[in-house]
């Protein structure tokens, strides 16, 4: 019986070897079943005969990518195997396929059983460590390698170089590399590819490539390692150098090298070179090549060409080229950039049919596409249907809500993301901070800032720019400046953001000083800088400075003014009441004035009650086609201010006939991290209705005692004065301020945000409220910030 069992086991081992070659899972499982029966029936006390077939069984399951079953067989084997080869097989499988933690865990179990690793064990474990970026574990294994005297082995040393380089420990990688007695092409390639992964490493990579040629000849894998470093610097010269090197060495025929060079040309914005490489590759092109060419078109902003190429790729499916999720996601992103909902929807259907819709990357780009096309409800429906979501999924939906004007929902999704246990990324904060800025939600903005500090995101310029904007729009201009001053690196956007922040707060002199500082640091202003600067001069009444910099923009900096610059200049001159100069300026404009230019002039006509000019300007706007309700409101206000009620009513009728609905006045205030919203006349919806109403009545009595009179012209309806007074009393900003007085201690400033311009009566009333209550009150309206203190507003009563 024992002899028969032994023969049966030997036969099973031979059969399993055959199954490994043929990857026949079904046959292998039958042999596994037979081995278990033999093990159950055997009466032998020594089970060592079963070691070889069970080890071969583990090898078989690894070959068939059935890692879970392989591990189960390994753990349940009759004897603990002392064969280091078997341990290496399983460690290698985990190192290549994951979970990588299991490879490291097996390594330590192996040591615990007294099994000595060999020169093949260490490279596999180090590969798992590099995948996990487990530097401390890798250093311990390095110590074990030194202890076992295998550092002289080129295979082990190369693995150490690769591990340290991929983990960013470049000095350690260089130290190991320099100590190697012998370096083959694989060792050099590991060093080069490892350095290529890290920003700013091109010079070192180029130096290594030159040194390598004195030792061994580079191969195509060397070039594949060099190309990421070239792509990082986006240098066409370096790209051409590597391309020439490949031509001389005969590497251009390699599909991987050709695809890499194509990718470099795309990232260098040299689409013609990229397309030439693509066409020269002929039939050797694979799916990655096609995907790289599509990506190159996207990087160079040739979106339609990217779609056309994708359609060509779909027709090649019968030629064996298989579409990948990466390519599909790239093309869906193209539809998002073009806001091509029709094509995007077709690709969504294709993703469903092909099964790619289950891919997380494809799902995230579909979310982004629907959001950018304005179909936020469709994006949310798809988001709810997703089986798996990550930080990118939440970021896409948050960004969609914010971009489509629903910051409150975006903030709610941000909170849901955190409750789901998913940590926000840099891109998430870059989407959330504008929502906080729009809502003036300082509590959430400050919390996001703290999170950014903890995660090290404040080193990112984009995050700092968003923080400056958020703090400025939450009324904390000093905090915004602190963020600006502490930035490690300030780009032109950073300076522009800070200049416009000073502008909307009416601190034009600081904006001018900052502009001087920017030039002192050697940074050249762009066209947006001058829009910010002239706007800041306009809000602060700095007419001479605004005129000077408008002229200097062309004469000293060679920047041709755009329509936005002319609109800012018209606003600057109009605010100062210089109507003759405005008229002359508009006549001399090389561009035909648009609605923005005439709208700026109409706003001044309202303030100065220049009805005649206002009517002329309004006709110009009507001829061009008004873009929003704002200009209708300005004209209606102007008629109401001089008692021309019929004309004011006619403007509102025209507004409705042309399909422009006036947005209801809405104001909000943040108290203890909760944003409270008030709609004009809609105070009844608030739970503290009675207290708010009583506080407003109390304030009205005190204000009248100090000389306050309602500006009834701000009521468009021709009704009794008493009724006008009640209508004005319940404007949204007054409701929010009254709630702030009730909710905040007297030493706390009040910040209210409004979606429209503050009306004249509210502006006057808030000056009186600041005088009565002895409180600092800040109101951010659609135009600027109004800082009220002791009955005075910093806008000088012009907004």
Where are each of the predicted segments found?
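Terminal (and in a subset, N-terminal) low-complexity or junction segments at the ends
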Residues: 1-184, 190-799
């Amino acid at each position: 019986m024992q002899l028969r069992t032994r023969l049966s086991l030997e036969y099973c081992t031979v059969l399993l070897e055959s199954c490994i070659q043929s990857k026949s899972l079904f046959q292998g499982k039958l042999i596994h079943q037979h081995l278990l029966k033999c093990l159950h029936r055997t009466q032998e006390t020594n089970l060592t005969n079963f070691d070889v077939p069970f080890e071969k069984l583990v090898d078989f399951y690894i070959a068939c990518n059935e890692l879970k079953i392989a591990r189960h067989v390994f753990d349940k084997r009759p004897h603990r195997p002392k064969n280091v080869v078997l341990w290496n097989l399983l460690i290698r499988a985990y190192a290549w396929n994951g979970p990588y933690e299991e490879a490291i865990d097996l390594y330590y179990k192996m040591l615990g059983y007294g099994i000595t690793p060999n020169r093949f064990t260490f490279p596999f474990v180090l590969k798992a460590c590099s995948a996990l970026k487990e530097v401390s574990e890798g250093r311990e294994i390095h110590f074990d390698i030194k202890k076992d005297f295998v550092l002289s082995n080129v295979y082990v040393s190369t693995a150490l170089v690769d591990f340290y380089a991929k983990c960013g420990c470049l000095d350690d990688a260089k130290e190991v590399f320099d100590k190697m007695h012998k370096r083959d092409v694989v060792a050099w390639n590991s060093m080069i590819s490892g350095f290529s992964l890290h920003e700013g490493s091109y010079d070192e990579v180029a130096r290594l490539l030159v040194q390598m040629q004195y030792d061994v000849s580079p191969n195509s894998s060397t070039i594949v390692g060099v190309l990421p470093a070239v792509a990082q610097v986006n240098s066409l010269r370096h790209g051409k150098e590597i391309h020439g090197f490949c031509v001389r060495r005969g590497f251009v025929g390699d599909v991987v090298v050709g695809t890499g060079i194509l990718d470099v040309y795309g990232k260098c914005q040299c689409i013609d070179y990229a397309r030439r490489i693509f066409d020269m590759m002929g039939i050797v092109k694979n799916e990655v090549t096609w995907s790289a060419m599509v990506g190159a078109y996207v990087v160079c902003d040739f979106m339609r060409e990217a779609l056309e190429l994708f359609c060509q790729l779909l027709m090649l499916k019968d030629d064996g080229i298989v579409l990948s999720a990466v390519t599909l996601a790239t093309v869906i992103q193209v539809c998002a950039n073009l806001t091509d909902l029709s094509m995007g929807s077709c690709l969504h259907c294709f993703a469903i049919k092909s099964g790619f819709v289950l891919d997380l990357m494809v799902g995230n780009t579909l979310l982004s596409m629907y959001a950018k096309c304005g179909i936020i409800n469709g994006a949310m429906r798809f988001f709810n249907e997703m089986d798996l979501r990550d930080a990118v999924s939440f970021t896409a939906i948050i960004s969609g809500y914010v971009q489509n004007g629903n910051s409150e929902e975006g903030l709610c999704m941000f909170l849901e993301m955190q409750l789901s246990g998913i940590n926000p990324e840099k891109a998430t904060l870059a989407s959330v901070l504008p929502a906080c800025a729009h809502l003036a939600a300082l509590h959430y903005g400050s919390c996001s800032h703290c999170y950014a500090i903890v995660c090290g995101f404040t080193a990112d310029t984009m995050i700092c720019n968003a923080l400056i904007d958020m703090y400025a729009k939450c009324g904390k201009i000093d905090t915004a400046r602190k963020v600006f001053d502490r930035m490690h690196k300030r780009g032109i956007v950073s300076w522009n953001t800070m200049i416009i922040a000073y502008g909307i707060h009416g601190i034009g002199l600081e904006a001018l000083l900052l502009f001087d500082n920017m030039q002192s640091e050697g940074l050249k202003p762009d066209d947006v800088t001058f829009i910010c600067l002239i706007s800041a001069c306009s809000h602060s009444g700095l007419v001479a400075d605004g005129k000077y910099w408008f002229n200097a923009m062309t004469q000293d900096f060679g920047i041709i003014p755009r329509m936005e610059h002319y609109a800012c200049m018209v606003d600057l001159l109009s605010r100062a009441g210089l109507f003759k100069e405005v008229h002359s300026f508009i006549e001399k404009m090389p561009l035909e004035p648009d609605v923005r230019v005439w709208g700026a002039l109409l706003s001044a006509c309202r303030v100065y009650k220049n009805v005649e000019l206002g009517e002329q300007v309004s006709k110009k706007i009507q001829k061009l086609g008004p873009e929003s309700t704002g200009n209708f409101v300005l004209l209606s206000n102007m008629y109401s201010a001089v008692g021309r009620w019929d004309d004011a009513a006619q403007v509102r009728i025209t507004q409705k006939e042309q399909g422009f609905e006036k947005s209801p006045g809405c104001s909000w205030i943040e108290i203890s991290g909760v944003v409270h919203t008030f709609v004009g006349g809609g105070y009844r919806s608030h739970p503290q209705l009675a207290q708010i109403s009583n506080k407003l009545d109390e304030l009205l009595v005190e204000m009248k005692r100090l000389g306050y009179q309602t500006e009834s012209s701000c009521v468009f309806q021709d009704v009794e004065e008493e009724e006008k007074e009640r209508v004005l009393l319940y404007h949204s900003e007054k409701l929010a301020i009254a709630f702030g007085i009730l909710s905040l201690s007297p030493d706390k400033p009040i910040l209210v945000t409004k979606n429209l311009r503050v009306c004249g009566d509210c502006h006057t009333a808030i000056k009186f409220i600041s005088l009565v209550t002895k409180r600092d009150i800040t109101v951010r309206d659609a135009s600027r910030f109004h800082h009220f203190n002791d009955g005075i507003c910093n806008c000088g009563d012009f907004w």
